[in-house]
UniProtKB/Swiss-Prot annotation:
Keyword Lyase recorded: no
Residue span, Tyr recombinase domain: 169-354
Active site: 210, 234, 306, 309, 332, 341
Record-stated family: Belongs to the 'phage' integrase family. XerS subfamily.
CDD domains: DNA_BRE_C (cd00397)
A Gene Ontology biological process term: cell division
Species name: Streptococcus pneumoniae (strain Hungary19A-6)
Protein name: Tyrosine recombinase XerS
Residues in Core-binding (CB) domain copies: 16-121
Listed PROSITE patterns: CB, TYR_RECOMBINASE
Organism domain of life: Bacteria
One Pfam family here: Phage_integrase
Amino acid sequence: MKREILLERIDKLKQIMPWYVLEYYQSKLAVPYSFTTLYEYLKEYDRFFSWVLESGISNADKMSDIPLSVLENMSKKDMESFILYLRERPLLNANTTKQGVSQTTINRTLSALSSLYKYLTEEVENDQGEPYFYRNVMKKVSTKKKKETLAARAENIKQKLFLGDETEGFLTYIDQEYPQQLSNRALSSFNKNKERDLAIIALLLASGVRLSEAVNLDLRDLNLKMMVIDVTRKGGKRDSVNVAAFAKPYLENYLAIRNQRYKTEKIDTALFLTLYRGVPNRIDASSVEKMVAKYSEDFKVRVTPHKLRHTLATRLYDATKSQVLVSHQLGHASTQVTDLYTHIVNDEQKNALDSL
């Protein structure tokens, strides 16, 4: 989603929120939480407070008038009723069942509410230096996490990774084979952004950065000589990330046409651009997701940019057998989250043995 549109939607939600949610928003913006994260949280609060009004828990006329005391006095039974409401209400997102939304969606909603309650009961200070209230009902609410072993996750993920020669094979396919099947009109559209698309996908495959980190890159963040990019990690931390050498020609080809193709001026600092009505703009995450899905589905299997991150991590672990190195490359504080890649690589080793 483009930043301008995102901020417009955030402003619309802020206009209907209670004052204490607006204080929460300002506090988290200072952390800083990303605008995308805060937008998702505001949507969850909109859903929750709409239910508060519909269920009669508050007799306020509108959402912004719901008093803080409603949250303070919310019972465990009330919150469980809200969870049941979510389970039985379909169409909250694409991952619905006949019975209602997925457990993942419910957990996301509860996570947003837990963050708000923690702020109100622990983090904020009133004039006396105390939180607004102390009773945190969210600590009494249990969440059900999806049960899946690392081996099961590895089995599910590995079919959607471009390992071995498939990494550069994917890039070669986009460059040489994909355009051969296009109509003249589609080919013209493809050629307009070919270098950019290849540069983005190559960078994701060669660095393992998150999609948000890639689209937020500025020109100054790329050091082609050293093959290093400076990114803003989760929580606003800056980090320098090494990029594999195979991405260099794709990045060079894009930079060679960037200014002329996208009609840039000095104010256009974003690394990856798109043209809208002749005006260059930073490419948004949604556009990259659609682009990766289109090319990957035609090549092998439809994947998300996050699977390209998994691809890099798996290849790096396979080459180094170092979880520490992989965790540093991905920007993780611990090696626990990299355990998944050991299972994927073990499966690859087993397949190699079976072929002997």
